Regions:
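Active-site-proximal, substrate-binding regions of enzyme catalytic domains
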Residues: 4-128, 137-145, 151-152, 156-162
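Conserved SAM-binding loop
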Residues: 132-133
Length: 168
């Protein structure tokens, strides 16, 4: 059975290990985080501290954008965009990784403490009963402080999250 995580699209470009899990995983990605890829690719601000890493991550972002824009994948994603909280059909990446895009709606329920994409991650996690996978330790801290009823894993604990019985 596939393990499900809620993530931002950029995580797939920054953390290559997410594309090579030891067992099947499904990543549910809010559509707005796919839109954010275009901003990150076009922006002059570095994503990574090291120039070489930054160039590589921007190349990976370009590959992700190309993947999402492929005709077949684009049609699947468009199916999710017809109604709030609708998910796309599965977009297989490899034998162990499948993506699904969700049209998450930021209801501003957590707007005081979280930005719109973070809010979409939270609401998607609640709706799907799946943990958030992030590299933002401060997000995990804020989730705990605000007592948000979701499970979240740091990307450094990815293997533990995949192997364990950690479903919410």
């Amino acid at each position: 059975m596939s393990k499900t995580f809620i993530i931002e699209a950029v995580m797939l470009a920054v953390h290559g290990q997410l594309m090579l899990p030891g067992q099947p995983v499904t990543y549910i990605i809010p559509y707005t985080s796919i839109q954010e890829l275009y901003e990150l690719q076009a922006g002059s601000e570095p994503i990574m501290l090291e120039e070489e890493d930054d160039g590589f991550v921007k190349q990976m972002i370009g590959e992700l954008i190309t993947f999402f824009e492929e005709s077949f994948n684009k049609k699947k994603i468009e199916k999710a965009l017809v109604a709030p909280w609708r998910k796309s059909p599965p977009l297989p990446i490899n034998e162990n990784v499948t993506l699904m895009v969700v049209l998450a709606i930021d209801t501003e329920a957590y707007g005081e403490h979280f930005d719109p994409i973070e809010t979409e991650l939270i609401l998607s996690s609640m709706k799907e009963q799946a943990p958030i996978l992030t590299d933002q330790f401060d997000l995990i801290e804020r989730l705990i402080q605000a007592e948000i009823p979701v499970q979240a894993f740091d990307v450094e604990d990815f293997e533990f999250a995949v192997e364990g019985d950690n479903q919410v």
